[in-house]
Amino acid sequence: MDKKINVFFGKYKFNTILGLLSIGIAFYVAMFTKTDTGYEWYFLIPGVFGFLLLIVRPLSFTDTGSIGPLILNYTMVIKYSISPLVSCLGGYHSWLGRYPGEDNINKAILITFYEMIVLFFENVYLTKKYKRKQINNVEISKPLRGRVAHCVIIVLGFAILFAMPSAFMDYRFLFDQTDLATTIRVDFAGSGIYKTLFTFARYSLVLVIVDFFYKRNLKRDSAINIIGAFIPTLLNCLYVSNLSRIGIFAPLLSCAFLIIILFNTPKARKTILYGIGTIGLLFIIYLSFVKFFGEGRGDTSNATSWLWWGDTLNMYFTGIKETAIGIKAKSLIDETYGLNRIALMFNDCFSNVSFISNLTNHDINSNKLYNIVYFGGNISVSQICPNICEGIYYFGTALSVVWPALFVYLSHLFSYKSHEKEYIDLKFIYIYSAIYCGMILMLNSAMIVCNIINISVLYAVVAFINKKVRIGVIKR
């Protein structure tokens, strides 16, 4: 009896709490969802999700060593548990976009249920697999292999910032609230490459500073070294494009978790985690309020409206309405591409990748066509097409879950590789990729692929060059 209690309220007590909460939400949604809305079976998603959390182990909500899966686990809770509750409280009200129709909502609930089941069990299997592999590994962390390439990138990136200010018109500091109503778009030739080089420079500067304090800490363990490494990570998040929350969240997490790996003591881990949690949460809350309710952005009365929050949460976590519109958009996708799904996938995945994006057609990628259906015309491209819908476009309904499942696998693989690699820059490459793959339920494939290639893959090239330069210097 004691063993059973320990399973539920010991190591996995957080799973038990979330599982019971989800089941409670399922009962609430079942009782208070009106008929003829299309959402009558919505309660099954939080209900089954909660049941699985109770009986299936070992998903962790506290394992900071697996950053990609950790993010995935929390976003699953929001999409499959919290979102149904908030949507129900708001009466499934929609304040943005067109109504997709009851039939498409029914299909969206079914496809979301399918997605949840497959991703949950895949996540459990991969968690067990990589946990077993990590037990046999001893993690080693080493400083940067030279700084020559990083210093060149820093000089080049910041030189571009000052020489080509027009390429960075959409960038602003976090606390700059001027002209909030305008979303600035910069798309002239070469602007994407300039931004990539500047982003490179920012990360290189952070890595060089982190490397400096890590070397100091190897000689003498001190909290000052942890703080010194964390400050540039924090400053790196203050200057972002159009006050993007992902633009703050991803850099903050990727660099902070790198610091956790390097300064791997219980005291350091706790200090950094509390720092990330407090500062990150304050930034996200502040930025969300500014973007939603700042001057010219929206009505402040929405801040206390369940109707508004229910629909907004669905937008950010690819909810039922968003999936239903994605299903409705399939006819437009078919009309545009016919059977040529390779062209569609190429347009989707590489539309924002530096040096390749000019080979794609932005006007007919799935996100553009999705937004045409979403708004009923060529009005905006602000909404994100869910990955499960892109899976439907590429592989059909039966195999649609293959697409998000691929990124779930990569989130586990990259998280594991971040511990397997020894050098700081290589660890950063895999941490950054793991974070973006872990946000699969929040982002579309274009956003994930472009960040992995623009930053991680190109950074791997820089790491390789840095290694060769260092070897050449040593041989001399």
Enumerate the language-model features and the residues they cover.
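Hydrophobic, membrane-inserted alpha-helices
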Residues: 22-28, 50, 205-208, 229-236, ...
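Membrane-embedded catalytic interface detector for glycan/lipid assembly enzymes
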Residues: 34-42, 127-268, 280-297, 371, ...
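Hydrophobic alpha-helical transmembrane segments
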Residues: 45-50, 153-160, 197-207, 381, ...
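Hydrophobic alpha-helical membrane-insertion segments
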Residues: 67-80, 151-165, 279-286, 346-360
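Small-residue-enriched transmembrane helix-hairpin modules in multi-pass membrane proteins
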Residues: 178-195, 283-407
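Hydrophobic alpha-helical segments
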Residues: 380-476
